[in-house]
Amino acid sequence: MTSLSESIETMFEPARLAVAEGRIPGVTLGLVTAKGERSVLTAGLAQREPESIPLHRAHWFDLASLTKVIFTTDNLIRLVEQGRVALDDPLSLHIPDLRQYETGAAERRLTIRQCLSHQTHLPAVEPLYTLGQDPETLRAYILQRNWKSGPPVYSDINFILLGILIERVTGTPLSAVDLSPGLTFRPDPASSAATEFCAWRGRMIRGEVHDENAFALGGVAGHAGLFGTVDGVLDYAASLMGRQRFSAPSMADLTTLSAGTRTLGWEIAHPGWHGGEGSSARTIGHLGFTGTGLWIDMDRGVAWTLLTNRVHPSRHSESGIMALRRETGTRLAAAFKQD
């Protein structure tokens, strides 16, 4: 096996090219092993418009849907281990006002496990922010909405509901939940990578959540709102590989196929997935719309995060982000070959 520094240089070549060709403003790649070895490389800009700002290792990235795993799934597993909830509890056990005017509604029978593994009838996304910016009114709407039924899909709505459940069980707003160093809901804008010029908000987004629904829900929701530095994300990955974060049964839930290509919260390696070719069978990963991603290969004992601001200054560009993610993961698998 090559050294960590050699491995990351090889892995970073496609990212450097993406920056040089102007497809992505800035990118940070971080590697960490189960033994605690770590290496980080950065290239490009934290902001391209309205002025250029170089990207540094300490910059905050809007993690987007990495919130679902690093924050929401993590907190739910903790509640399970504390005996405060069970994975097969219906949401209505902890959110009694969920569809309270129709006791036979399908939403009242949805379980925590189904939402975590995206096995519900709920839609992928809904433009909730168009209904207003009062968080409590939006939460009430979400809970009483008669959602159109469809086949299971990867759904923000699943995790918005799980975020509400966490608040109900703990009695604490999501925004007040304690976070580890390197993770925050309120980053310094001056130290944050810019995302998109938001026509709805009328400004370039930097240091505030990019996701419109999370913004309208107060800045934090179960599906988005978390920011992290590369080291904050790597610290989280290392804690999972080190087996000290959760019990063995909980770790098995996170790394064992639940339905489709999903474990609880995470996606697991499968042919054609975003983590590239050559991942071990117990590799889990997740993506964020802003251009972020985290992958953890439990068998090899290595994790990597690719953090970009590919939506800056607009999401409507050909960034090639999915191909970049796959190529980066494929190069890692080649560098960390298993015997």
PLM region descriptions:
Residues 40, 47, 102-283:
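Short, surface-exposed loop or secondary-structure junction motifs
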Residues 7-11, 63, 67, 72, ...:
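Hydrophobic (often cysteine-bearing) scaffold residues that line and stabilize catalytic clefts
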Residues 86-103, 181:
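Short, glycine/proline-biased beta-turn/loop segments that scaffold the active-site neighborhood
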Residues 39-41, 294, 301-310, 314:
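Short, well-ordered beta-strand elements
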Residues 15-16, 35, 60-88, 162-167, ...:
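Active-site SXXK
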Residues 242, 250, 255-260, 271-273, ...:
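Short, gly/Ser/Thr-rich active-site loops of penicillin-recognizing serine hydrolases
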Residues 4-61, 84, 315:
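Short, conserved catalytic-motif segment at the N-terminal edge
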Residues 25-27, 290-293:
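Short loop/turn microsegments at loop-to-beta-strand junctions
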